[in-house]
Structures are given as C-alpha cells and as structure tokens.
Amino acid sequence: MNLDQLEVSHDADSLCVVIEISKHSNIKYELDKESGALMVDRVLYGAQNYPANYGFVPNTLGSDGDPVDALVLSDVAFQAGSVVKARLVGVLNMEDESGMDEKLLALPIDKIDPTHSYVKDIDDLSKHTLDKIKHFFETYKDLEPNKWVKVKGFENKESAIKVLEKAIKAYQG
C-alpha cells in the first residue's frame, strides 16, 4: 500500500482510517512505512482479542511519534489493510512504557455501516462498550516483560478533533 497515493480525508465526519488489526484478532500487525507491507509485530501474550478494528489515520503524527491510532467500532471485522471512512466520536487517553498515547474512537460512516448511526459522541456509546475497550488496553500487555499501560480515561468528540488537529499539524511540521 502506497499511502502517498491515497486521497486522505482528515474531516472528523469522514476520516480515512487504515485498518492494521481486525476486530477480534489476537495478532498485532503494523504497516511498514517503507514497503507498505503489513508486518506481524507479535501475537498478544494474553488471552485477549482486540475489541474493535484498530489502525491509524494517515498523514498524522501522534504524541508517540507514530501516526495517530484509531479504533473503528463496528459489529463487523474489517480486513487488515483496508481503508475505512469513519467519523470521530471520542478519544481514549492512555500512557504506556513509551509515553502518552491517544486512541481516536470512530464509527464507520453511515454509507458503509449505518448500524450505529445514532452515535454522535462518546456519551452515546454504551458503558459496556467503553468498559470493554478500557479493560482491553489496561490488560493486553500484562504478560509482556517491561511493558505496561495506564488508561487515563475517555473524552468526547470535541477533544478527539483537537487530538486529530494537533496530529495533522505535527505531521506537516
């Protein structure tokens, strides 16, 4: 995949997210920036599976030095390597052994999957959905040596837009 050839949208209501890890996977993949190949990073050490599709927003730079991460919440698992247009609804703030790490929370645009069209902001998501996401990130590195995570909490769509705007500016230098 050549991201330079991809028409990237940074519109909060129609954001391009490159999926690296499908929902329910227990394998962590990362897109190699040079080759565009989807590389296996590791199999998760514990019994957890990703609670959502996981990827990144191209042409951004998060506080961890990588493109800003995004979870695309859906009842379906999108193929790793696919690009999903999604709309922001919130952000998960966390810290790990490498520093602060924000995860944008998004849903597929209604044209792709209208199942959750009623969700406009983080408060529209069920407590159970947020609890599953929080629990996953609090525990998915537990069995890995020298790795840890502290979940700081969730914030709304407005905060997510600020994280996105900061990441776009950081990428543009």
From Swiss-Prot:
Which EC class is this protein assigned?
hydrolase
Q: Which GO terms describe its molecular function?
A: inorganic diphosphate phosphatase activity; magnesium ion binding
- Spell out the InterPro entries in the cross-references: Pyrophosphatase, Pyrophosphatase_sf
This protein's UniProt keywords? Cytoplasm, Hydrolase, Magnesium, Metal-binding
Q: Name one GO cellular component term.
A: cytoplasm
Question: Principal place where this protein is found?
Answer: cytoplasm
* Compartment annotation: Cytoplasm
Q: Pfam families attached here?
A: Pyrophosphatase
Annotated GO biological process: phosphate-containing compound metabolic process
Q: Which residues participate in substrate binding?
A: K28, R42, Y54, Y140
Q: Which EC numbers does the record give?
A: 3.6.1.1
> What SUPFAM superfamilies does its record include?
Inorganic pyrophosphatase (SSF50324)
Q: Which family does it belong to?
A: Belongs to the PPase family.
On subunit structure and binding partners, the annotation says: Homohexamer.
The name under which this protein is listed is Inorganic pyrophosphatase
Record organism = Helicobacter pylori (strain J99 / ATCC 700824) (Campylobacter pylori J99)
Q: What is the gene name?
A: ppa
